[in-house]
């Protein structure tokens, strides 16, 4: 284990006790385990799967999951401080972990500060409990592929990836580029446009945020990924072709995102 000093000295940066503890935990696990594997991931352009197993065993996969669901309850600042320590030793893990944690922050800290009526709030709480259980108990990894090569991610147009509503769920069709964790995440947290019929015009007002199981029929990964310094993120192209998902794979309430 490296005996490196913390990036953010607790007394100088006036860290809270929670921030100090999480920074210590991430520094210890990254300096003792991640650093020795980092070169291999970059050389092979392979995903840091072993590091995620260590994060799960160290109770860090739920770093930003609310405490009442069994998580560590870190806010954005606390997570950023802790993740900085991971980045010192394995950039690929820090970058991809950010995608996973962002899903937890959106459904957790962000959602808790949005206005919802009681019905939507109860629905969201019930659904996110299921997603959080997957993460905490199974170590499930949630990716966050948004990019499509158009203006949608900037909020200038509707997402080209669509979710056709059916009686039992949605049928997803579309493509995401630069999709980090492709082929390695358990669930893809996808932004898409809900359609109520095949002839419905796409609208930004109908943006959906849903989880697509990576092993679901119709999901595939294409293309190469070989950029300098980011090979381990495995940000290839995701294709969704008539992929069915049930309603409980919703990550954020409809009309809220």
Predicted regions and their residues:
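A glycine-rich, basic-preceded beta-loop-alpha segment at the flavin cofactor/substrate interface
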Residues: 241-257
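Structural beta-strand/beta-sheet cores of well-ordered domains, especially the beta-sheet scaffolds
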Residues: 140-142, 159, 186-188, 208, ...
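N-terminal capping segment at the start of a domain
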Residues: 30-39
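Flexible, small-/acidic-enriched active-site or ligand-binding loops
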Residues: 217-244
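N-terminal glycine-rich anion-binding loops that anchor highly charged ligand groups
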Residues: 22-29, 46-62
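Glycine-rich flavin
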Residues: 49, 56, 63-176, 180
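Intrinsic disorder at enzyme termini
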Residues: 1-18
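A short core secondary-structure module
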Residues: 175-221
